[in-house]
A protein has these predicted regions:
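Helix N-cap motif at beta-to-alpha junctions
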Residues: 18-19, 78-80
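Core segments of cupin and vicinal oxygen chelate
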Residues: 13-56
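Short beta-strand micro-motifs in enzyme catalytic cores
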Residues: 42, 71, 106-110
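Residues that flank catalytic or metal-binding motifs in active/ligand-binding sites
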Residues: 8, 40, 46, 69-71
């Protein structure tokens, strides 16, 4: 073990073009609240951090690839049909990867992109 405390995962970060638009999106749909607002970086409840694309590109020196499908944010919701109604009424332009489907193990899920092409899955509890 390094030092006296065990390392732990603190946050996960997604890159966004418009941090305020993204904050509103995650607040509206998932009830996440802003905890920290730094210039171009925002931490929301449940460990989600938002980083403005212009700063991220500067840090990495690489282009951001929306809809890369290399990872997803996963949420669970018992009332998935109610969530879909909320999603479609608040964000009718949402781009689906797959509409409501049921996996072979019985879990209902939907997948869609946030406004910046980050993949989101919402499923019934496993």
């Amino acid at each position: 073990m390094y030092g006296e405390q065990q390392m732990k995962l603190k946050n996960f970060l997604i890159v966004v073009k418009d941090i305020e638009r993204s904050r509103q999106f995650y607040e509206d749909l998932f009830g996440l609240e802003m905890l920290v607002d730094n210039d171009g970086n925002m931490v929301l409840s449940d460990g989600l951090a938002l980083q403005e694309e212009k700063y991220w590109k500067e840090f990495l020196g690489k282009e951001i690839i929306p809809e890369s499908n290399s990872c997803e944010l996963y949420f669970e919701e018992a009332d998935i049909e109610g969530f879909i109604k909320k999603l479609e009424s608040m964000y009718p332009e949402v781009k689906y990867v797959n509409r409501l489907m049921t996996h072979s193990w019985g879990q209902k899920v939907i997948r869609f992109y946030d406004p910046d092409g980050n993949l989101i899955e919402v499923g019934t509890p496993i």
